[in-house]
């Protein structure tokens, strides 16, 4: 195999796929990137056997072929080079040689046939969506995904696709996000869970234009221009999340997202490093945020103007979880809907963005003092 390419183009393509390469793989071949000549282009593929990332790049192919090349060493070398022309020459023993106008380098590759084949994702449900809308939806939900290995069904974002809309749901038991996208529709209804790691790779790989999602029983494929991400789905049943969303929430507070978020971040510095507990005291058109740390004999209190005309109420939250929820609402003002201090609070943007309906839920914490 022989080809010519600039180091700038190669480092861009390598960076797009290398994020999935395991640093210490049980199968040594997975520490490589597969290089293939396909229809006059150079195609790069990387995988950890759960996620596959494919990137195609322009190159001058002078001899067709394929080879697996150590990913880290090649990428580290490319990053240290200026944007200059490179000539690659790979022989039948998988010896990889490449030259610049200044020097020559040699690596030992591996046979392409030892590299895992891409899963077949040919049939199933198809969804076509604007890429920016898709990546925005992923970012608004995946922050709430569980990291608990004992609950694998919650370690991804749950997609419910039908002919009219798609629901994306994520929860870790403390927070829950339900995002309905009306501009994201499937030709066949289907429900599936995509692992968080795969979605993180999707947001790094996809760039502009439209993205096509193809969903089969075991895999999902994202295609965006010359880039492709294939991921194995989580083969578990998702919890019945609708049951935990309170239906009657008569206490409504509307507040500036930025004002409340900044206040929560400041006051939480004084909260217990163990519980991260803060207290919200709701009163007429004002919410007071209070935190204290017994061990350090420190406390903080700030008030924020809001719209609230119900009876006074005190409710506690984990400061980090509350900040995460607020940080993932892009609108100016948010509404909080409460029923009682021991039931979940619902957070929504005052004005929903076009073609979507965002609902976030945060569980309260047991208050241990009266602040």
Residue positions per predicted region:
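Structural preference for solvent-exposed beta-strand-turn elements
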Residues: 1-371
